[in-house]
Protein backbone atom coordinates (compact mmCIF):
# COMPACT_ATOMS: atom_id res chain seq x y z
CA UNK A 1 0.00 0.00 0.00
CA UNK A 2 1.40 3.40 -1.02
CA UNK A 3 0.25 6.39 1.01
CA UNK A 4 0.19 10.02 -0.04
CA UNK A 5 2.19 11.78 2.67
CA UNK A 6 4.01 15.01 1.80
CA UNK A 7 6.47 15.02 4.71
CA UNK A 8 8.27 12.71 7.14
CA UNK A 9 6.18 9.53 6.98
CA UNK A 10 7.96 7.40 9.59
CA UNK A 11 4.86 6.93 11.72
CA UNK A 12 3.04 5.37 8.74
CA UNK A 13 5.99 3.21 7.66
CA UNK A 14 6.41 0.99 10.72
CA UNK A 15 5.13 -2.09 8.89
CA UNK A 16 1.53 -1.90 10.08
CA UNK A 17 0.04 0.80 7.79
CA UNK A 18 1.80 1.71 4.52
CA UNK A 19 4.56 -0.10 2.67
CA UNK A 20 5.73 3.13 1.02
CA UNK A 21 4.69 6.71 0.41
CA UNK A 22 4.76 9.12 -2.50
CA UNK A 23 8.19 10.62 -1.90
CA UNK A 24 7.54 14.35 -1.99
CA UNK A 25 10.72 14.98 0.04
CA UNK A 26 12.63 13.49 -2.91
CA UNK A 27 10.53 15.62 -5.28
CA UNK A 28 11.29 18.90 -3.53
CA UNK A 29 15.02 18.15 -3.35
CA UNK A 30 15.09 17.39 -7.09
CA UNK A 31 13.17 20.54 -7.94
CA UNK A 32 15.52 22.62 -5.78
CA UNK A 33 18.76 21.30 -7.25
CA UNK A 34 17.97 20.43 -10.85
CA UNK A 35 15.59 23.36 -11.34
CA UNK A 36 18.25 25.81 -10.22
CA UNK A 37 17.64 29.43 -11.15
CA UNK A 38 14.71 28.47 -13.39
CA UNK A 39 12.72 27.01 -10.49
CA UNK A 40 9.56 29.02 -9.81
CA UNK A 41 9.90 29.46 -6.04
CA UNK A 42 6.59 31.36 -5.86
CA UNK A 43 4.68 28.06 -6.14
CA UNK A 44 3.80 26.15 -2.98
CA UNK A 45 2.89 22.59 -3.99
CA UNK A 46 1.27 20.81 -1.07
CA UNK A 47 1.73 23.99 0.96
CA UNK A 48 5.51 23.56 0.98
CA UNK A 49 7.85 26.38 0.00
CA UNK A 50 10.21 25.52 -2.85
CA UNK A 51 13.85 26.45 -2.41
CA UNK A 52 16.77 26.49 -4.84
CA UNK A 53 19.54 24.19 -3.60
CA UNK A 54 23.28 24.21 -4.10
CA UNK A 55 25.00 20.87 -4.65
CA UNK A 56 25.98 20.80 -0.97
CA UNK A 57 22.43 21.55 0.18
CA UNK A 58 21.10 18.89 -2.20
CA UNK A 59 23.56 16.35 -0.77
CA UNK A 60 22.41 17.26 2.74
CA UNK A 61 18.74 16.79 1.76
CA UNK A 62 19.49 13.44 0.12
CA UNK A 63 21.47 12.28 3.17
CA UNK A 64 18.61 13.37 5.44
CA UNK A 65 16.16 11.45 3.25
CA UNK A 66 18.35 8.34 3.26
CA UNK A 67 18.62 8.52 7.06
CA UNK A 68 14.87 8.97 7.52
CA UNK A 69 13.72 5.41 6.82
CA UNK A 70 15.05 1.87 7.16
CA UNK A 71 16.91 0.75 4.01
CA UNK A 72 14.17 -1.76 3.12
CA UNK A 73 11.62 1.07 3.27
CA UNK A 74 13.83 3.40 1.20
CA UNK A 75 14.04 0.76 -1.54
CA UNK A 76 10.26 0.86 -2.07
CA UNK A 77 9.53 4.59 -1.77
CA UNK A 78 7.60 5.98 -4.75
CA UNK A 79 10.08 8.56 -6.09
CA UNK A 80 8.22 11.10 -8.19
CA UNK A 81 9.07 14.27 -10.04
CA UNK A 82 5.47 15.24 -10.86
CA UNK A 83 2.06 14.24 -9.57
CA UNK A 84 -1.64 14.91 -9.86
CA UNK A 85 -1.56 17.37 -6.94
CA UNK A 86 1.13 19.77 -8.08
CA UNK A 87 2.38 21.53 -11.21
CA UNK A 88 4.42 19.28 -13.46
CA UNK A 89 8.19 19.34 -12.99
CA UNK A 90 8.90 20.86 -16.41
CA UNK A 91 6.37 23.64 -15.74
CA UNK A 92 7.92 24.47 -12.37
CA UNK A 93 11.36 24.81 -13.99
CA UNK A 94 10.27 27.16 -16.76
CA UNK A 95 10.15 24.50 -19.47
CA UNK A 96 13.80 23.49 -18.95
CA UNK A 97 13.82 19.96 -20.35
CA UNK A 98 17.52 19.53 -19.58
CA UNK A 99 16.64 19.99 -15.90
CA UNK A 100 13.94 17.34 -16.31
CA UNK A 101 16.45 15.00 -17.95
CA UNK A 102 18.96 15.39 -15.11
CA UNK A 103 16.25 14.89 -12.50
CA UNK A 104 14.98 11.83 -14.38
CA UNK A 105 18.46 10.34 -14.54
CA UNK A 106 18.76 10.86 -10.78
CA UNK A 107 15.29 9.35 -10.26
CA UNK A 108 16.22 6.24 -12.25
CA UNK A 109 19.51 5.77 -10.39
CA UNK A 110 18.33 6.57 -6.84
CA UNK A 111 17.09 3.90 -4.39
CA UNK A 112 13.34 3.41 -4.54
CA UNK A 113 10.62 2.90 -7.13
CA UNK A 114 10.70 5.58 -9.84
CA UNK A 115 7.25 6.87 -10.74
CA UNK A 116 6.87 8.67 -14.07
CA UNK A 117 3.68 10.74 -14.11
CA UNK A 118 1.96 10.21 -17.44
CA UNK A 119 3.03 12.73 -20.06
CA UNK A 120 6.29 13.81 -18.41
CA UNK A 121 8.12 11.49 -20.81
CA UNK A 122 6.87 13.51 -23.81
CA UNK A 123 7.25 16.99 -22.28
CA UNK A 124 3.66 17.53 -21.15
CA UNK A 125 3.16 20.73 -19.18
CA UNK A 126 0.61 21.54 -16.54
CA UNK A 127 0.16 24.04 -13.76
CA UNK A 128 -1.51 23.72 -10.39
CA UNK A 129 -4.39 21.27 -9.95
CA UNK A 130 -6.45 20.78 -12.09
CA UNK A 131 -3.86 21.87 -14.69
CA UNK A 132 -1.59 19.00 -13.73
CA UNK A 133 -4.34 16.50 -14.59
CA UNK A 134 -4.79 17.35 -18.27
CA UNK A 135 -5.45 14.72 -20.88
CA UNK A 136 -2.51 12.89 -22.42
CA UNK A 137 -1.49 14.38 -25.82
CA UNK A 138 -2.23 11.37 -28.04
CA UNK A 139 -1.10 13.19 -31.21
CA UNK A 140 2.53 12.04 -31.53
CA UNK A 141 3.31 15.25 -33.39
CA UNK A 142 2.98 17.03 -30.04
CA UNK A 143 5.52 14.78 -28.33
CA UNK A 144 9.10 15.76 -27.58
CA UNK A 145 10.63 12.64 -29.11
CA UNK A 146 14.15 13.47 -27.90
CA UNK A 147 12.82 13.57 -24.35
CA UNK A 148 10.93 10.30 -24.84
CA UNK A 149 14.11 8.63 -26.11
CA UNK A 150 15.97 9.92 -23.05
CA UNK A 151 13.34 8.49 -20.71
CA UNK A 152 13.50 5.13 -22.45
CA UNK A 153 17.30 5.04 -22.15
CA UNK A 154 17.25 6.04 -18.48
CA UNK A 155 14.66 3.34 -17.72
CA UNK A 156 16.71 0.76 -19.66
CA UNK A 157 19.82 1.78 -17.70
CA UNK A 158 17.99 1.03 -14.44
CA UNK A 159 16.56 -2.23 -15.77
CA UNK A 160 19.95 -3.45 -17.03
CA UNK A 161 21.93 -2.74 -13.85
CA UNK A 162 20.76 -4.47 -10.66
CA UNK A 163 22.95 -2.17 -8.55
CA UNK A 164 20.65 0.71 -9.54
CA UNK A 165 17.68 -1.15 -8.11
CA UNK A 166 19.13 -2.84 -5.04
CA UNK A 167 22.68 -1.57 -4.52
CA UNK A 168 23.91 0.49 -1.59
CA UNK A 169 24.10 4.26 -2.03
CA UNK A 170 27.17 6.37 -1.28
CA UNK A 171 27.46 10.09 -1.88
CA UNK A 172 30.82 10.96 -3.43
CA UNK A 173 30.90 14.65 -4.35
CA UNK A 174 28.96 17.87 -3.94
CA UNK A 175 30.70 20.70 -5.79
CA UNK A 176 28.93 24.05 -5.50
CA UNK A 177 31.32 25.82 -7.87
CA UNK A 178 30.64 23.38 -10.71
CA UNK A 179 27.07 22.57 -9.65
CA UNK A 180 27.92 18.85 -9.59
CA UNK A 181 26.65 16.01 -7.45
CA UNK A 182 28.08 12.48 -7.69
CA UNK A 183 27.23 9.21 -6.01
CA UNK A 184 27.83 5.48 -6.33
CA UNK A 185 25.45 2.52 -6.31
CA UNK A 186 27.30 -0.56 -5.08
CA UNK A 187 26.03 -4.05 -5.68
CA UNK A 188 27.22 -7.44 -6.84
CA UNK A 189 28.89 -7.69 -9.28
CA UNK A 190 29.08 -3.99 -10.14
CA UNK A 191 29.51 -0.48 -8.81
CA UNK A 192 28.14 2.39 -10.85
CA UNK A 193 29.13 6.03 -10.41
CA UNK A 194 26.66 8.73 -11.44
CA UNK A 195 27.72 12.36 -11.91
CA UNK A 196 25.02 15.00 -12.36
Task: List the model feature ranges, each with a label.
Residues 173-196:
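Carbohydrate-binding surface patches
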Amino acid sequence: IVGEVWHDARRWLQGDQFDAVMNYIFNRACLGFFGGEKLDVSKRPGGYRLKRLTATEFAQEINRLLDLYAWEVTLVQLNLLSSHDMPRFVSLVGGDKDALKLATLFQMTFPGAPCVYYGDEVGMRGGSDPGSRGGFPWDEGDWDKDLLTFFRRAIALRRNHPALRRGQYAGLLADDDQGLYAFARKGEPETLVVVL
